[in-house]
Amino acid sequence: CDGRALGANDGSDWANAFTCLQSALAVARPGDEIRGAQGTYRPDRHGEEVPHGARVVASGRRTDTFVLPSGVTLRGGYAGFGAADPDARDIDAYKSVLSGDLAGNDIPPAGNDWQSIHDFVLDNSRADNSQSVLTVSSAGNTSLLEGFTITGGHAGLDSDVEGNGSTASAARDGAGAFIVASSPRFVRCAF
């Protein structure tokens, strides 16, 4: 997946990579591996069932989320399209970010002290952010997320999270990752 790719948007290689991560996740099946190039991905679309499968449409709704399907591996930190070696992988040099900051307007905390972080968490300007950035539901322990930073989620009381046909009550939890009846593996990820 690479938002800079210019090809067929079918995921067959880096030149034809899906430009929308949610499109790649919508067609992923158990055993598939999705590679995420450097960049920021926002869950600003949702899946809709259509006669021959699912399609992903833009919406910008706070309830949209990345849904990691059962048995699917999602790896970040790749150089991606346009690089001399698009398969080069270094999660520190090629940061892949799943961000709930749908409007791209979050301001980072002023410092690492308790008060700065407390003020950041309670900042109402983030109320337009995605309620849950990533959702894993009924996936057992076969799903893997590796090499991503997850940021910008803003869960709200009595909210529902929707994605690829699944709905779960996120309530006040799960701003970064909302996990239901699953035990996915997160490797070298930051929240």
PLM-predicted stretches and their roles:
Residues 22, 26-30, 44-73, 81-146, ...:
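Extracellular beta-strand-rich solenoid/capping regions of secreted or surface-exposed proteins
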Residues 161, 190-191:
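Leucine-rich, hydrophobic repeat-scaffold detector
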Residues 32-36, 76:
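Extracellular beta-strand repeat scaffolds in secreted/surface proteins
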Residues 37-40, 47:
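Short, well-ordered beta-to-alpha junction loops that form the rim of enzyme active sites
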